[in-house]
């Protein structure tokens, strides 16, 4: 892309600016010095006196308007009028316009020939016919002589000659008058048939159609090299045109006034051209009038011929598609003009010549309505003129002028055909010329003119029609992409349900086969020295994976559909249920959509894409081998050079001022998809004016970005009781998160485990379970990068789990549960409960009659009651001997997922009955509290029966059915402690049975702080508001019972963040997305880059696992994570994302050269106006990356080897500076300067229409940004807790 060099020159003076605008007007104005114009004004004054003076003045203003519009078109577009008409109209329309322009030039030349012949007759007494021949000969002399001159010299000669002639003509008339009579006895009060002929003559004498094309041509030539802005150039042209045509108008007024005084006042009638010349002698008051008359006509004739020789070329080329020499063109026009003049002289003499001159002016006036239609349409077209199109006042004047021309022509034609006026009868029964040629010619010309008027009025410009069609097509395409039909969704849903069972059966069989044939080996689990590295991010996928990612990204617009009809997944929520009345029960039959994303994202089905799966599996194998060889410290930042097709040969990193493909790393399709993704996400929050949409306001999202942000953040530090009332349950250890992130903690956790120890509470080997849910849950936690399942637990961190534990030498598989969404969950849970009950009954542990007496209770409730019965009967064994208990405080989490491996003793079971009595209040997640134990126990090593049995080698453990009986005592007092030692610690130390069964080495530096933070089932907005042990035992089908005022903000924030995760996932699938998330040019931008790096790590891990065990139908997107008080996953993250979006879109706009993408960026920037206020209007403290954004060093991929043997480009360090309003203002100025230099190819639709329109739209939104940002003096607090200037937990780690 070529960049234009703009030279700044000193401001030009008035004369220097006016000369380029004055030269075209001089060449055009000479065409008005001809006998035809004089005769028309003399005839009007002689017949109607002063009545037509005002009308003549209006005609002069119309001429100024038309000539100014013609010049404005050329100045603004850089193209002349004929060229634009050729682009905007079809072939036949252009041909008619070209014939009309040539006919106008012939009529003008005819009057010149007749005038020169009369002048020769007066001076030398030659015959008129001889004078016509002599006048015709000069047409061959001057153009031939001019052809030997250079074009520049010929233009100079003609321009100076035109100026001299015009000056002598106007000054001679005005200075010869002792006083200019200004008396007007009256004005025309009605438009009658008698005055129609004279008015048509005056109109033709005031405006010449083909002068539009000449003026447009020379205006573009004279101002093409000017550095003055277009608005100033247009004003200069208007001033020059007004001055010159005002002088011509004064001359016409003098002639009309003299004719009124001489002829109209005395009752005489002008019959011949000699009578008109006698009046000219009185006007000039000099006996030298014949000589001056001859000189004026001769020079004006030559100048007009030379001007048309240059300007008429464009008419021949663009309209008629004819290529002939200029001299031949001029000779043809002169021959066609001489023929009717000779005929008139031979048949009618001097009287016929006078009538012929008036007749020519009437014919010219009949062509005016056809000529001004394309002129005014082009000038008022925004697609062509852009911001420089004529204003509404100009459009009104143009429309009024056209209607005036058309009305006068209609009145003339009607009077000529049906009228009884003198001139109409004289035309019909003309005896002067002996025939009715004049009448026939006028009638045919009028009919042709009216037909062409109708044709042009019904034919729109191509640019306008193409743009309308493009807008309709784009709207239909966007609707088709954004809103899939109900039929498609139903078909997809039906196929998913039909194939669900088959997929599960295949999955179980494959997993079973793999587990049977896979040998379990030990793996080293080592934590990185620095968990959060500033310059370490995930590298791009290997070629095989990139091929699969491209498959995703190219089809994501059509394949990432929203399953909004499948039970409208809501964020899991559980609240403290005290005694509530029926009026507090709120039945939510359908959750209103806040964002287009649902927890289940539908990605293109890969069942038929076996080749992509095979390639991806091969890529995983290759990656495993490569990872063993690569150094773990050689990491690659996200800010790479993009895909190979966009990398330069220089190998320089960063973002310079090179080409767009080199800088951005995004192809055209990727940039288009990027703008579509951002517009989709922000479209559910803001409209095109930056205002919250009604749906978002109804969900109280304005409170998240407004004054309620502080309350939302402060709410996290309140006590447990206050958090319960607000619908948010605070982790007890969140306050101590910074202390937990010290190096001593990681030093203690980094140690190797002994062979006899167990990796972590989630380190269970995957067993063969008959339940499909267990296999499905196995997929959620496994993010290994191996292909043989023997190193699957080499990951140092589970998805959104902040536990750091030593590695396992026993290679146990992960069994971490995850939040599972979907309509099939209820059936899965019921099947599990049913199988569990049947197993208990078959073993004789529960009487069958007792189980059957439960009536209509669900299997889940029956299982819970059965567990309660076993606990009350004393079946729960005591603690297992030989295991040291770990007495650390834990976060408040869901009761069903707490430390079920801690083998408790029998205790109080009163809360179990209360739990069964209560009912489950939400429908998005079934109750699996009674199944967690069994589901996990079934997968212990060497477990044959699915339970912990001493005889099966399970470590001497018995069934742990009584854990629910004592959980109320364990967690009853946890609500009042935030960041302090737990009461549970004392209980655990005094009662060994309450300790976890699996011990972890505890560092002395950790104190009583917990190594645990929220797990995926404890994520923010999912299950944060637990308060009762029996909450999870309530029926899933019962209605929700929550406090809307307390939980609406939390729910809205959770859904918004979940939608944000979907958006990030779509962005990282774009080819070349490494550039997007690799700039790190601000604190907000760096935070979003880290979020994207974490999401990409998780996505790639899921993709590898799914490719190993087979496609499961739909990838599961877990809920929003939360690691404690300092977690970044809150509403402030959306504000940071907005700042990131503004910065990235402006960066793209800085180097963008496609008007199509300018428009898409404009849409996104319009919506992002809503982010300006929350981001820059208040003092904001930047957030610090937390545990949730960490990527284990063992999974930091090695940087690929450079092709030329050189080291890869260094990672761009984070600047640690905040993006302020001043920063964006500077960037906006650069964008404005950049787009102002963009130009399309002249003569194309892109260069003439798309570029001006795109510049206008983008400049408009940038002006709004400048206005709003200039009023935002307050920015982010760079010295706050999240600043680089302060040493925080993140700063010490990164």
UniProtKB/Swiss-Prot annotation:
GO molecular function per UniProt: chromatin binding; histone binding; metal ion transmembrane transporter activity; mRNA binding
Topological domain ranges for the Cytoplasmic compartment: 1-12, 72-105, 149-155, 216-237, 309-334, 377-397, 462-1294
GO cellular component, one term: nucleus
Residue segments, region Disordered: 534-561, 623-662, 1269-1294
Pfam families in alphabetical order: Nramp
InterPro entries according to UniProt: EIN2 (IPR017187), NRAMP_fam (IPR001046)
Keywords noted in UniProt: Auxin signaling pathway, Chromatin regulator, Cytokinin signaling pathway, Cytoplasm, Endoplasmic reticulum, Ethylene signaling pathway, Membrane, Nucleus, Phosphoprotein, Plant defense, Stress response, Transmembrane, Transmembrane helix
PTM comment text: Phosphorylated by CTR1 on at least 4 sites. Phosphorylation of Ser-645 and Ser-924 is involved in repressing EIN2 signaling. Loss of phosphorylation results in nuclear localization of the C-terminus of EIN2.
Start-end of Basic and acidic residues biased regions: 536-550
Source superkingdom: Eukaryota
Phosphoprotein in keyword set: yes
Disrupted gene: phenotype observed: Complete ethylene insensitivity. Extreme salt sensitivity during seed germination and plant growth leading to epinastic backward growth of leaf blade and petiole, and small rosette size. Reduced ethylene-induced histone acetylation of H3K14 and H3K23 associated with a lower induction of ethylene-responsive genes.
Transmembrane region(s): 13-33, 51-71, 106-126, 128-148, 156-176, 195-215, 238-258, 288-308, 335-355, 356-376, 398-418, 441-461
Phosphothreonine: residues carrying this PTM: 819
Topology Extracellular: residue spans: 34-50, 127, 177-194, 259-287, 419-440
GO annotation terms (biological process): auxin polar transport; auxin-activated signaling pathway; cell division; cytokinin-activated signaling pathway; defense response by callose deposition in cell wall; defense response to bacterium; defense response to fungus; epigenetic regulation of gene expression
Motif mapping: Nuclear localization signal: 1262-1269
Annotated function: Central factor in signaling pathways regulated by ethylene (ET) and involved in various processes including development, plant defense, senescence, nucleotide sugar flux, and tropisms. Necessary for ethylene-mediated gene regulation, and for the induction of some genes by ozone. Acts downstream of ET receptors, and upstream of ethylene regulated transcription factors. Required for cytokinin-mediated processes. Seems to be implicated in cross-talk between ET, jasmonate and other pathways. Probably not involved in iron uptake.
Quaternary structure and partners: Interacts (via NLS) with ETR1. Interacts (via C-terminus) with EER5 and the COP9 signalosome subunits CSN3, CSN6A and CSN6B. Interacts with ETP1 and ETP2. Interacts with CTR1. Interacts with all members of the ethylene receptor family, including ETR1, ETR2, ERS1, ERS2 and EIN4. Binds to MRF3/ECIP1.
The record's note on its domains: The N-terminal (1-560) region seems to be regulated by upstream components of the ET signal transduction pathway, and may in turn regulate the C-terminal region. The C-terminal (454-1294) region regulates downstream events of ET and jasmonate signaling pathways, and can confer constitutive responses to ET. The C-terminal (1047-1294) region is necessary and sufficient for interactions with ETP1 and ETP2. The nuclear localization signal (1262-1269) is required for interaction with ETR1.
Further details from the record: 'Oresara' means 'long living' in Korean.
Protein name per the record: Ethylene-insensitive protein 2
Gene: EIN2
């Amino acid at each position: 892309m070529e960049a234009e060099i703009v030279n700044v020159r000193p401001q030009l003076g008035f004369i220097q600016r006016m000369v380029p605008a004055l030269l075209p007007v001089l060449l055009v104005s000479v065409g008005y010095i001809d006998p035809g114009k004089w005769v028309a004004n003399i005839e009007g004054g002689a017949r109607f006196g002063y009545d037509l003076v005002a009308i003549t003045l209006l005609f002069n203003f119309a001429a100024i308007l038309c000539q100014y519009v013609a010049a404005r078109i050329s100045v603004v577009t850089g193209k002349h009028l004929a060229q634009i008409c050729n682009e905007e109209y079809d072939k036949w329309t252009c041909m008619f316009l070209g014939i009309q322009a040539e006919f106008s030039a012939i009529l003008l030349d005819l009057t010149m020939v007749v005038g020169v012949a009369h002048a020769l007759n007066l001076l030398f007494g030659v015959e008129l016919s001889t004078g016509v021949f002599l006048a015709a000969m000069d047409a061959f002399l001057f153009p031939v002589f001019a052809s030997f001159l250079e074009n520049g010299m010929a233009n100079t000669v003609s321009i100076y000659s035109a100026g001299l002639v015009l000056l002598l003509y106007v000054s001679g008339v005005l200075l010869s008058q002792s006083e200019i009579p200004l008396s007007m006895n009256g004005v025309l009060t009605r438009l009658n048939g008698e005055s129609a002929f004279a008015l048509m003559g005056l109109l033709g004498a005031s405006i010449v159609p083909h002068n539009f094309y000449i003026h447009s041509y020379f205006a573009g030539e004279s101002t093409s090299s000017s550095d003055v802005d277009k608005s100033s150039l247009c004003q200069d042209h208007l001033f020059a045109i007004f001055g010159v045509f005002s002088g011509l108008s004064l001359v016409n007024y003098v002639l009309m006034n003299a004719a009124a005084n001489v002829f109209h006042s005395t009752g005489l009638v002008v019959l011949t051209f000699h009578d008109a010349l006698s009046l000219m002698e009185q006007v000039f008051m000099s006996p030298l009038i014949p000589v001056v008359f001859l000189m004026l006509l001769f020079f004006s004739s030559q100048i007009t011929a030379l001007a048309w020789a240059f300007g008429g070329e464009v008419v021949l080329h663009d309209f008629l598609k004819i290529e002939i020499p200029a001299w031949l063109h001029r000779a043809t026009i002169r021959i066609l003009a001489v023929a009717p003049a000779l005929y008139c002289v031979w048949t009618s003499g001097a009287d016929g010549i006078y009538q012929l001159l008036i007749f020519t002016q009437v014919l010219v006036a009949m062509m005016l309505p056809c000529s001004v239609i394309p002129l005014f349409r082009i000038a008022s077209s925004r697609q062509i003129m852009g911001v420089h199109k004529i204003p509404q006042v100009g459009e009104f004047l143009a429309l009024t002028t056209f209607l005036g021309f058309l009305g006068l022509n209609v009145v003339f034609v009607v009077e000529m055909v049906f009228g009884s006026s003198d001139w109409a009868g004289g035309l019909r029964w003309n005896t002067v010329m002996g025939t009715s040629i004049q009448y026939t010619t006028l009638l045919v010309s009028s009919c042709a003119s009216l037909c062409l008027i109708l044709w042009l009025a019904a034919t729109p410009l191509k640019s306008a029609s193409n743009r309308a069609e493009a807008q309709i097509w784009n709207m239909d395409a966007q609707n088709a992409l954004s809103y899939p039909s109900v039929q498609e969704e139903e078909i997809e849903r039906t196929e998913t349900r039909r194939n669900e069972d088959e997929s599960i059966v295949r999955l179980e069989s494959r997993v079973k086969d793999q587990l049977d044939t896979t040998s379990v080996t030990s793996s080293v689990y080592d934590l990185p020295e620095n968990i959060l590295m500033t310059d370490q991010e995930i590298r791009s996928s290997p070629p095989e994976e990139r091929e699969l990612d491209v498959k995703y990204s190219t089809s994501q617009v059509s394949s990432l559909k929203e399953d909004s009809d499948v039970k409208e997944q809501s964020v899991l929520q559980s609240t403290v249920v005290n005694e509530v009345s029926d009026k507090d029960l709120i039945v939510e039959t359908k959750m209103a959509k806040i964002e287009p994303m649902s927890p289940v994202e539908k990605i293109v089905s890969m069942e038929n894409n076996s080749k992509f799966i095979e390639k991806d599996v091969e890529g995983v194998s290759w990656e495993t081998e490569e990872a063993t060889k690569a150094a773990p410290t050689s990491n690659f930042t996200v800010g790479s050079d993009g895909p190979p097709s966009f990398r330069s040969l220089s190998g320089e990193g960063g973002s310079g001022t090179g080409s767009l493909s080199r800088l951005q790393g995004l192809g055209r399709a990727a940039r288009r998809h990027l703008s579509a993704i951002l517009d989709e996400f922000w479209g559910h929050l803001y409209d095109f004016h930056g205002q919250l949409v009604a749906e978002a306001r109804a969900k109280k999202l304005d409170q998240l970005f407004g004054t309620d942000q502080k309350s939302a953040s402060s709410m996290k530090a309140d006590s447990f009781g206050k958090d319960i009332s607000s619908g948010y349950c605070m982790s007890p250890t969140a306050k101590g998160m910074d202390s937990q992130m010290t190096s001593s903690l990681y030093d203690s956790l980094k140690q190797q485990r002994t062979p006899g120890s167990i990796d972590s509470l989630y380190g269970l080997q995957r067993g063969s379970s008959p339940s499909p849910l267990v296999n499905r849950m196995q997929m959620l936690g496994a993010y290994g990068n191996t292909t043989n399942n023997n190193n699957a637990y080499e990951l140092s961190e589970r998805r959104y789990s902040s536990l750091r534990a030593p590695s396992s030498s026993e290679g146990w598989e992960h069994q971490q549960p995850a939040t599972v969404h979907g309509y099939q969950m209820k059936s899965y849970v019921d099947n599990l409960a049913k199988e569990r009950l049947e197993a208990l009954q078959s073993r004789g542990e529960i009487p069958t009659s007792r189980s059957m007496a439960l009536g209509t209770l669900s299997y889940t409730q029956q299982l819970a009651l059965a567990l309660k019965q076993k606990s009350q009967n004393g079946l729960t064994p005591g603690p297992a001997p030989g295991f040291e208990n770990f007495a650390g405080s834990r976060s408040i989490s869901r009761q069903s997922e707490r430390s079920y491996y801690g083998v408790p003793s029998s205790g109080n079971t009163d809360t179990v009955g209360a739990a069964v009595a209560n009912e489950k209040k939400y429908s998005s997640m079934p109750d699996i509290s009674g199944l967690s134990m069994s589901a996990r126990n079934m997968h212990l090593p060497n477990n044959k029966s699915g339970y912990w049995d001493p005889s099966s080698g399970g470590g001497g453990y018995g069934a742990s059915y009584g854990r629910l009986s004592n959980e109320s005592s364990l967690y009853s007092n946890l609500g009042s402690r935030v960041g302090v030692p737990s009461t549970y610690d004392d209980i655990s130390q005094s009662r060994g049975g309450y300790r976890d069964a699996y011990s972890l080495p505890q560092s002395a530096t950790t104190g009583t702080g917990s190594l645990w933070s929220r797990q995926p089932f404890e994520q923010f907005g999912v299950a944060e508001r637990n308060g009762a042990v029996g909450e999870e035992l309530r029926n899933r089908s019962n209605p929700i019972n929550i406090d809307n005022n307390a939980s609406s903000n939390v729910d809205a924030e959770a859904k918004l963040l979940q939608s944000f995760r979907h958006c990030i996932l779509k962005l990282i699938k774009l080819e070349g997305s490494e550039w997007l998330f690799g700039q790190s040019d601000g604190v907000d931008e760096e935070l979003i880059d880290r979020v994207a790096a974490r999401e990409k790590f998780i996505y790639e891990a899921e993709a590898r696992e799914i490719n190993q065990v087979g496609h499961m139908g739909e990838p599961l997107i877990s809920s929003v994570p939360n690691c404690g008080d300092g977690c970044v996953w809150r509403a402030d993250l959306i504000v940071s994302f907005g700042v990131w979006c503004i910065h990235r879109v402006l960066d793209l706009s800085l180097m963008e050269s496609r008007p199509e993408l300018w428009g898409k960026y404009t849409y996104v920037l319009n919506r992002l106006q809503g982010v300006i206020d929350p981001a820059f209007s208040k003092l904001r403290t930047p957030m610090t990356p937390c545990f949730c954004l960490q990527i284990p060093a063992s999974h930091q991929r090695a940087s690929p080897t450079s092709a030329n043997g050189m080291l890869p480009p260094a990672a761009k360090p984070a600047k640690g500076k905040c993006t302020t309003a001043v920063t964006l203002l500077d960037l906006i100025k650069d964008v404005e300067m950049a787009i102002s230099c963009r130009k399309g190819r002249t003569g194309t639709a892109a260069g003439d229409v798309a570029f001006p329109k795109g510049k206008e739209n983008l400049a408009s939104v940038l002006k709004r940004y400048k206005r709003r940002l200039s009023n935002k003096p307050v920015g982010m607090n760079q010295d706050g807790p999240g600043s680089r200037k302060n040493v925080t937990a993140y700063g010490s780690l990164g």
